[in-house]
Regions:
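Signature aromatic-anchored transmembrane alpha helix within multi-pass, membrane-resident enzymes
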Residues: 96, 184-191, 322-354
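Hydrophobic, aromatic-rich transmembrane alpha-helices
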Residues: 245, 254-281, 285
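Extracellular and organelle-lumenal recognition/adhesion modules and their flexible linkers in secreted
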Residues: 473-629
Length: 629
């Protein structure tokens, strides 16, 4: 899944672009600022996981390039599944348990949703846990200790998790004094490292500009120490937080319940018969459901990865302890059926409490869309291959991960001293509005300092020309413009017409109270907020659409200029870009016309979301063709 997502240009700057840059950086013995963060990777996460695999970079990366980290992560997931199987086989020679645990491991919902995050430290670090438990069970304590150290240094939450893992191991190995001694030692080591981590090591990485920002548990306290004190002083309130919505946003009322239900049905019910295995889930469930961010509470993205890594082992160790064979087989079947049912059910937007946290294009493997891309993949890869490995590059969200293994990579529209810019015209920076992104792209497309060297729609590659001698006053070959000043009315059906005779608006909204150019405008009030939907047929013969309108309004973000192309492309503008001497504000909405839209038609409309009336005049729609075509 991860390999295909990357190949089809679905991996994102957050996180895979940052991870690829950090991996390259570590492999070249550097510690640099990552593309989307004001600090280095170690300041974002105190983890050495990527450093473990620097030798793999030098062995494999010449061949696998930006796919290397995905290959490493997938290999660790498979290795973790293999060690989970080996542990179950230690406890039982029942062939159904062995087959069942492998099947179950890859049926759980969280195994699929985790791929929406591409590569993540949580996924990597979790894979060490079954490996450690296996070597602990077979009494290879030195090897287990080595895995413990790798685990502790892999992510900040691991030391606390290991304290509870060792408690379960003490219960499980209670007749083995040597095992108990090692487990108690493990608790002490984990606790000491956890204290040192937050008291010494993490503060050492902080600076005036960058502080550690991943302990987000305001309901408990500002630090792990404060959180522990709160839970000891207010145990009932702390337990309540595991189940209630403490965000004060009713949207997330049932998110925690959904998480518990999904994994209870997906085999977790078995643990009710062997509750000792619930113990090692306590810290990883707490880190989810007590967090300030409600999206972490539920079943979104990789936020359940620790659970789905340990749940197969827990469920099948519990099943292995059942005495009767028919009970074991029944439990295996029920767990696997529950898992596959919940996975298929919850990979559908309509079946989730918070639908927007699902990215089906990256995780819904049984959908045709999972195997398609918005790009001409081969053509875009050829385009990217022309960029020198040493060049400084500014790239947009889904392009950057493919170019991140270099000394200087920037997240467009941050250009700095870049020699190349490459972006998709639909690849918006999430912190900017659509029109802010559009204006940034057009600034460079129309600049005489940047040459469009290649393009494979919707991707453009630009090269910097420091002399600024290029003659690129316009990138368009032709433009078809229609206008409406709300003065021309059809005698036949009493509708307001565009300059080409097409219908623009109904006369019900016509007003003479205000006008910008002549005597009429249309009035949108609280009684009639919406203008007519204007259909723009056969628009795919053009490349670019620009809609301009003037409005007289009093409130901020009161006017909304909206356009749709098919079901999947929606564009919006509510901020004016200029104002004339009479107080009329100009709003512009522009976008590249999708080549793979579900329809050949686009449409537009204007609406008023405010409490006061607005007046609309001088509507202009411009359709353009690109010179390069």
């Amino acid at each position: 899944m991860g390999l295909l997502n990357h190949y089809l240009f679905r991996t994102a700057t957050h996180d895979y672009g940052n991870y690829n840059f950090a991996f390259w950086d570590y492999s070249h013995f550097r510690l640099s600022q990552i593309p989307t963060f004001k600090g280095n990777f170690l300041q974002d996460h105190f983890s050495f996981s990527l450093m473990y695999f620097v030798p793999v970079y030098w062995i494999l990366n010449w061949l696998t390039h930006t796919y290397t980290l995905i290959i490493i992560q997938v290999s660790l997931i498979i290795l973790s599944a293999w060690y989970t199987l080996k542990i179950v086989q230690l406890k039982s020679d029942n062939i159904w348990l062995g087959a069942g645990v492998i099947l179950y491991y890859f049926l759980l919902l969280g195994r699929y949703t985790a791929f929406s995050a591409d590569v993540n430290l949580a996924i990597i670090s979790s894979c060490f846990i079954p490996i450690f438990i296996y070597y602990f069970f077979i009494k290879k304590y030195l090897l287990a200790f080595a895995i413990l150290l790798l685990s502790l240094f892999s992510r900040e939450n691991i030391p606390l998790w290991f304290i509870f893992i060792f408690i379960v191991l003490i219960i499980d190995e209670r007749k083995d004094k040597k095992a108990i001694w090692y487990a108690v030692s493990g608790i002490i080591i984990s606790a000491l490292y956890f204290i040192l981590l937050f008291k010494v090591f993490i503060p050492m990485t902080e600076s005036k500009e960058v502080s550690y920002g991943l302990f987000n548990y305001a309901a408990l306290g500002a630090t792990p120490g404060e959180a522990l004190v709160y839970m000891l002083r207010h145990p009932v309130e702390a337990v309540k937080l595991f189940f209630i919505n403490h965000s004060n946003n009713p949207t997330y009322n049932d998110v925690k319940a959904e998480f518990y239900l999904v994994y209870l049905v997906s085999g977790g019910f078995v643990l009710l018969f062997r509750p000792k295995y619930i113990i090692w889930f306590i810290p990883i469930v707490a880190q989810k459901v007590l967090n300030d961010n409600p999206t972490r509470w539920g079943i979104a993205t990789y936020y359940s990865i620790e659970i789905v890594t340990l749940l197969p082992l827990s469920v099948f160790l519990a099943i292995a302890s059942f005495k009767k064979s028919w009970i074991q087989k029944t439990a295996i079947v029920l767990a696997c059926i529950g898992a596959i049912f919940m996975t298929i059910h919850k990979l559908d937007h309509s079946n989730r409490k918070v639908p927007w946290t699902l990215n089906p294009s990256k995780v819904k493997v049984y959908s045709k869309k999972f195997y398609t891309s918005h790009y001409n993949v081969k053509a875009v890869n050829r385009l990217l291959a022309t960029i020198p490995d040493t060049a400084k590059v500014s790239a947009s969200n889904y392009i950057l991960p493919h170019l991140a293994q270099r000394k200087s990579i920037y997240y467009f529209p941050n250009v700095k001293d870049a020699e190349y810019i490459v972006f998709s015209v639909y690849d918006n920076h999430y912190l900017l509005t659509h029109m802010q992104n559009e204006n940034e792209r057009n600034k460079y497309l129309g600049s005489n300092e940047w040459e469009i060297t290649q393009h494979s729609f919707p991707v453009f590659l630009l090269k910097h020309n420091s002399k600024g001698t290029l003659n690129t006053n316009s990138i368009w070959t032709e433009a078809d413009t229609i206008k409406c000043n709300y003065e021309t009315i059809s005698e036949k059906d009493k509708t307001i017409l565009f300059s080409n005779g097409e219908k623009a608006e109904k006369t019900d909204l016509l007003s003479t109270e205000q006008a910008r150019s002549l005597t009429h405008s249309i009035k949108l009030s609280t009684e009639a907020r919406y203008g007519s939907k204007i259909t723009l047929p056969d628009i795919t013969q053009y490349d670019y659409l620009e809609i301009n309108v003037w409005a007289l309004c009093e409130e901020l973000n009161q006017i909304h200029l909206v356009s749709d192309c098919g079901k999947n492309y929606h564009f919006h503008c509510s901020v004016n870009n200029s104002i004339d001497s009479s107080g009329w504000k100009k709003f512009t909405l522009s976008y590249w016309i999708p080549k793979n839209a579900a329809t050949t038609e686009c449409s537009m409309f204007i609406w008023n979301s405010g409490k006061t009336p607005v007046y609309i005049d001088d509507l202009e729609i411009v359709k353009k063709k690109l010179k390069l075509n």
